Amino acid sequence: MSIDSLPPLREVIERHDLMPKKSLGQNFLFDLNLTSKIARQAGDLRDQPVIEVGPGPGGLTRALLAQGAYVTAIERDDRCLEALAEIAAHYPGRLRIIAGDALEQDFTALFPEGPKPRIVANLPYNVGTQLLLNWLLVEPWPPFYSSMTLMFQREVAERIVAKPDSDHYGRLGVLAGWRTQAKIAFDVPPQAFTPPPKVMSSVVHIVPRETPLPCRAEALGQITQAAFGQRRKMLRQSLKSIGGAALLEKMGIDGTRRAETLSVEEFVALANACLP
């Protein structure tokens, strides 16, 4: 059934009293041209499984279904479930709704067989970074998903794609650069949302590397957390709790350098040396 046969989103929100909750990091998208653009960025979705986190009233959900996807939508706001159920009725067998917190979801169990899902979502701003970290550090690798097309605040998007010696380079950039190839696809202005956030947003497209540099995810997660937790300090100080100066000397890395100057490859080498 056509997306045009569904009632307008503003009507759905009014009927179900779905004003966005700041406590849940909700900013709803009404522009169907924009939601369709996000869905297209994920590639050809015909008969492909898609995971959507935080669908809210279902603006992006509609676009994904209209492009032929099989959508699994995870929503913790019970107020939105009835509106999503109405969409499911228009697309029989194509929308699975899971009521719950995405941070507690076992994503690997959602698709035990068949093609890997794509993750496509306008992520709630208050949990978006943590969800991405979880998906970057998931084991085993290659991961349970084939790609991610995600909306973030522009500042977070810049951290994901940042390179060494740049203002935005940090733990997120190291982990994303290690295991994936990420790019900012396009920006979304505040006025596209209800309520409009105070900052620009960006859609990021992320594709997993089949064979990233060998390293334990837990080890790299720990060493980047230590290094960037005190990013203005020299490495011999910020890494003091895990060997500091001796470890850096062993690896031939100048202990007076700061975390933002190290390449992904250097972080991987440090992680392999200190946390085998």
Curated annotation (Swiss-Prot):
Its EC number is 2.1.1.182. S-adenosyl-L-methionine binds at residues 27, 29, 54, 75, 101, 122. Disulfide bonds: none annotated. It comes from the Bacteria. GO terms for cellular component: cytosol. SUPFAM superfamilies: S-adenosyl-L-methionine-dependent methyltransferases. GO terms for molecular function: 16S rRNA (adenine(1518)-N(6)/adenine(1519)-N(6))-dimethyltransferase activity; RNA binding. The keyword Methyltransferase applies. It is found in: Cytoplasm. Keywords: Cytoplasm, Methyltransferase, RNA-binding, rRNA processing, S-adenosyl-L-methionine, Transferase. InterPro entries: KsgA/Erm, rRNA_Ade_diMease-like_C, rRNA_Ade_Mease_Trfase_CS, rRNA_Ade_methylase_Trfase_N, rRNA_adenine_dimethylase, SAM-dependent_MTases_sf. Its main location: cytoplasm. Pfam families: RrnaAD (PF00398). It catalyses: adenosine(1518)/adenosine(1519) in 16S rRNA + 4 S-adenosyl-L-methionine = N(6)-dimethyladenosine(1518)/N(6)-dimethyladenosine(1519) in 16S rRNA + 4 S-adenosyl-L-homocysteine + 4 H(+). Belongs to the class I-like SAM-binding methyltransferase superfamily. rRNA adenine N(6)-methyltransferase family. RsmA subfamily. Specifically dimethylates two adjacent adenosines (A1518 and A1519) in the loop of a conserved hairpin near the 3'-end of 16S rRNA in the 30S particle. May play a critical role in biogenesis of 30S subunits. PANTHER family: DIMETHYLADENOSINE TRANSFERASE (PTHR11727), DIMETHYLADENOSINE TRANSFERASE-RELATED (PTHR11727:SF7). This is Ribosomal RNA small subunit methyltransferase A. The lineage of its organism: Bacteria, Pseudomonadati, Pseudomonadota, Alphaproteobacteria, Hyphomicrobiales.
